[in-house]
Design a protein with these regions (language model features):
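N-terminal glycine-/serine-/threonine-rich beta1-alpha1-beta2 phosphate-ribose binding loop
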Residues: 1-116, 132-144
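Short alpha-helix within the catalytic core of nucleotide-sugar-dependent glycosyltransferases
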Residues: 129-133, 158
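The substrate-binding groove and active-site-proximal loops of carbohydrate-active enzymes
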Residues: 45, 121, 148
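Predominantly a Rossmann-like dinucleotide-binding segment in NAD(P)-dependent oxidoreductases
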Residues: 27, 144-146, 151-191
Length: 191
Protein backbone atom coordinates (compact mmCIF):
# COMPACT_ATOMS: atom_id res chain seq x y z
CA UNK A 1 0.00 0.00 0.00
CA UNK A 2 1.35 3.38 -0.94
CA UNK A 3 0.77 6.05 1.71
CA UNK A 4 -1.10 9.20 0.82
CA UNK A 5 1.72 11.69 1.15
CA UNK A 6 1.11 15.38 1.02
CA UNK A 7 2.28 18.53 2.68
CA UNK A 8 3.06 18.30 6.36
CA UNK A 9 0.13 19.38 8.55
CA UNK A 10 0.29 23.04 9.53
CA UNK A 11 -0.68 22.24 13.09
CA UNK A 12 1.60 20.20 15.26
CA UNK A 13 1.08 17.43 17.76
CA UNK A 14 1.97 19.55 20.76
CA UNK A 15 -0.12 18.77 23.80
CA UNK A 16 -0.51 21.14 26.71
CA UNK A 17 1.48 20.06 29.77
CA UNK A 18 -0.47 18.03 32.30
CA UNK A 19 0.01 18.48 36.02
CA UNK A 20 -0.98 14.85 36.50
CA UNK A 21 -0.79 12.18 33.79
CA UNK A 22 -3.52 9.59 34.26
CA UNK A 23 -2.21 6.21 33.09
CA UNK A 24 -3.90 2.97 32.16
CA UNK A 25 -2.26 -0.37 31.43
CA UNK A 26 -3.46 -3.13 29.12
CA UNK A 27 -1.49 -6.32 29.68
CA UNK A 28 0.30 -7.31 32.88
CA UNK A 29 2.14 -10.33 31.51
CA UNK A 30 5.77 -10.19 30.44
CA UNK A 31 6.38 -6.45 29.85
CA UNK A 32 3.49 -4.60 31.49
CA UNK A 33 4.81 -4.86 35.07
CA UNK A 34 8.11 -3.19 34.11
CA UNK A 35 6.24 -0.20 32.64
CA UNK A 36 3.99 -0.06 35.69
CA UNK A 37 6.99 -0.18 38.02
CA UNK A 38 8.64 2.72 36.19
CA UNK A 39 5.48 4.86 36.21
CA UNK A 40 4.95 4.28 39.93
CA UNK A 41 8.25 6.09 40.55
CA UNK A 42 7.37 9.20 38.54
CA UNK A 43 5.95 12.19 40.37
CA UNK A 44 2.82 13.43 38.64
CA UNK A 45 1.91 10.05 37.14
CA UNK A 46 -1.24 8.39 38.43
CA UNK A 47 -2.12 4.75 37.82
CA UNK A 48 -5.87 4.84 37.19
CA UNK A 49 -6.65 1.43 35.72
CA UNK A 50 -5.24 -1.95 34.75
CA UNK A 51 -6.71 -4.43 32.27
CA UNK A 52 -5.68 -8.05 31.76
CA UNK A 53 -7.80 -11.08 30.92
CA UNK A 54 -5.75 -13.15 33.38
CA UNK A 55 -7.08 -12.28 36.84
CA UNK A 56 -3.85 -13.06 38.77
CA UNK A 57 -1.93 -10.74 36.42
CA UNK A 58 -4.25 -7.77 36.92
CA UNK A 59 -4.27 -8.41 40.67
CA UNK A 60 -0.46 -8.44 40.63
CA UNK A 61 -0.54 -5.00 38.98
CA UNK A 62 -2.96 -3.71 41.60
CA UNK A 63 -0.75 -5.08 44.39
CA UNK A 64 2.32 -3.41 42.88
CA UNK A 65 0.43 -0.11 42.85
CA UNK A 66 -0.80 -0.25 46.44
CA UNK A 67 2.58 -1.51 47.67
CA UNK A 68 4.06 1.68 46.18
CA UNK A 69 1.69 3.65 48.42
CA UNK A 70 -0.67 4.65 45.61
CA UNK A 71 -4.45 4.23 45.46
CA UNK A 72 -5.68 0.91 44.07
CA UNK A 73 -6.41 1.13 40.34
CA UNK A 74 -9.72 0.08 38.84
CA UNK A 75 -9.39 -3.40 37.31
CA UNK A 76 -10.73 -4.61 33.96
CA UNK A 77 -10.38 -7.80 31.96
CA UNK A 78 -13.52 -9.90 32.24
CA UNK A 79 -13.32 -10.55 28.48
CA UNK A 80 -10.82 -9.81 25.67
CA UNK A 81 -12.59 -6.55 24.76
CA UNK A 82 -12.98 -5.20 28.30
CA UNK A 83 -10.11 -2.82 27.57
CA UNK A 84 -12.64 -0.78 25.54
CA UNK A 85 -14.76 -0.29 28.66
CA UNK A 86 -11.63 0.95 30.43
CA UNK A 87 -10.92 3.41 27.61
CA UNK A 88 -14.57 4.52 27.52
CA UNK A 89 -14.46 5.62 31.16
CA UNK A 90 -12.85 8.83 29.85
CA UNK A 91 -10.40 9.23 32.71
CA UNK A 92 -7.12 8.33 30.97
CA UNK A 93 -4.52 10.52 29.31
CA UNK A 94 -2.29 7.66 28.18
CA UNK A 95 -2.46 3.89 27.95
CA UNK A 96 0.43 1.42 27.93
CA UNK A 97 -0.30 -1.55 25.63
CA UNK A 98 1.74 -4.66 26.48
CA UNK A 99 -0.35 -7.43 24.97
CA UNK A 100 0.19 -10.15 22.36
CA UNK A 101 1.35 -8.60 19.09
CA UNK A 102 -1.86 -9.07 17.12
CA UNK A 103 -3.71 -6.82 19.60
CA UNK A 104 -1.31 -3.86 19.36
CA UNK A 105 -2.85 -2.10 16.34
CA UNK A 106 -6.53 -2.50 17.25
CA UNK A 107 -5.90 -1.47 20.86
CA UNK A 108 -3.76 1.50 19.82
CA UNK A 109 -6.37 2.66 17.32
CA UNK A 110 -9.18 2.20 19.86
CA UNK A 111 -7.24 4.27 22.40
CA UNK A 112 -6.48 7.15 20.03
CA UNK A 113 -10.07 7.15 18.72
CA UNK A 114 -11.15 7.74 22.33
CA UNK A 115 -8.69 10.60 22.86
CA UNK A 116 -6.06 8.59 24.74
CA UNK A 117 -2.37 8.64 23.79
CA UNK A 118 -1.15 5.11 22.96
CA UNK A 119 2.22 3.76 24.12
CA UNK A 120 2.61 0.41 22.40
CA UNK A 121 5.10 -2.33 23.22
CA UNK A 122 7.29 -3.58 20.36
CA UNK A 123 6.44 -4.32 17.68
CA UNK A 124 3.76 -1.64 17.36
CA UNK A 125 2.45 -3.48 14.29
CA UNK A 126 3.23 -6.69 12.44
CA UNK A 127 2.31 -5.46 8.95
CA UNK A 128 3.04 -2.34 6.94
CA UNK A 129 -0.70 -1.70 6.69
CA UNK A 130 -0.89 -1.88 10.48
CA UNK A 131 1.88 0.70 10.75
CA UNK A 132 0.02 3.05 8.42
CA UNK A 133 -3.20 2.53 10.36
CA UNK A 134 -1.46 3.71 13.53
CA UNK A 135 0.14 6.70 11.77
CA UNK A 136 -3.08 7.78 10.07
CA UNK A 137 -5.11 7.41 13.27
CA UNK A 138 -2.55 9.42 15.23
CA UNK A 139 -2.56 12.21 12.65
CA UNK A 140 -6.35 12.31 12.41
CA UNK A 141 -7.02 12.20 16.18
CA UNK A 142 -3.99 14.32 17.18
CA UNK A 143 -3.09 11.70 19.79
CA UNK A 144 0.47 10.53 20.19
CA UNK A 145 1.36 6.95 19.33
CA UNK A 146 4.74 5.78 20.58
CA UNK A 147 6.39 2.42 20.13
CA UNK A 148 8.04 1.51 23.43
CA UNK A 149 11.41 0.66 21.91
CA UNK A 150 14.03 0.76 24.62
CA UNK A 151 17.21 -0.26 22.81
CA UNK A 152 17.89 3.21 21.39
CA UNK A 153 17.78 4.74 24.88
CA UNK A 154 20.39 2.48 26.49
CA UNK A 155 23.61 3.79 28.02
CA UNK A 156 25.78 2.73 25.07
CA UNK A 157 23.44 4.15 22.43
CA UNK A 158 23.15 7.50 24.19
CA UNK A 159 26.92 7.63 24.69
CA UNK A 160 27.49 7.16 20.94
CA UNK A 161 24.85 9.80 20.18
CA UNK A 162 26.62 12.23 22.49
CA UNK A 163 29.97 11.45 20.85
CA UNK A 164 28.45 12.16 17.43
CA UNK A 165 27.10 15.49 18.65
CA UNK A 166 30.50 16.38 20.10
CA UNK A 167 32.21 15.65 16.77
CA UNK A 168 34.33 12.78 18.11
CA UNK A 169 33.94 10.91 14.81
CA UNK A 170 34.36 13.95 12.60
CA UNK A 171 31.77 14.78 9.97
CA UNK A 172 29.35 11.89 9.65
CA UNK A 173 28.33 11.17 6.09
CA UNK A 174 26.58 7.85 6.60
CA UNK A 175 25.62 5.65 9.50
CA UNK A 176 24.13 2.22 9.76
CA UNK A 177 23.28 0.00 12.69
CA UNK A 178 21.27 -3.08 13.44
CA UNK A 179 19.71 -4.81 16.38
CA UNK A 180 18.85 -8.35 15.47
CA UNK A 181 17.56 -11.32 17.38
CA UNK A 182 15.53 -14.25 16.16
CA UNK A 183 11.80 -13.72 16.68
CA UNK A 184 10.52 -16.23 14.13
CA UNK A 185 9.07 -18.36 16.92
CA UNK A 186 6.87 -15.44 18.02
CA UNK A 187 5.65 -14.83 14.47
CA UNK A 188 4.55 -18.48 14.29
CA UNK A 189 2.42 -17.95 17.39
CA UNK A 190 0.29 -15.33 15.62
CA UNK A 191 -0.08 -17.07 12.25
Amino acid sequence: RTPKLGPMPKDDFAVAPLKTVRCGFIGMGARGPSHLSAILKIEGAEVVSICDTHQPSREKGAAMTTKAGKPAPKLYGTDPYDYRRMLDEGNLDVVFISTPWEWHVPMGVDAMERGVHALIEVPAAITVDGCWELVETSERTKRHCMMLENVNYGREELAVLNMCRLGVFGELLHGEAAYIHDLRWQMKEIE
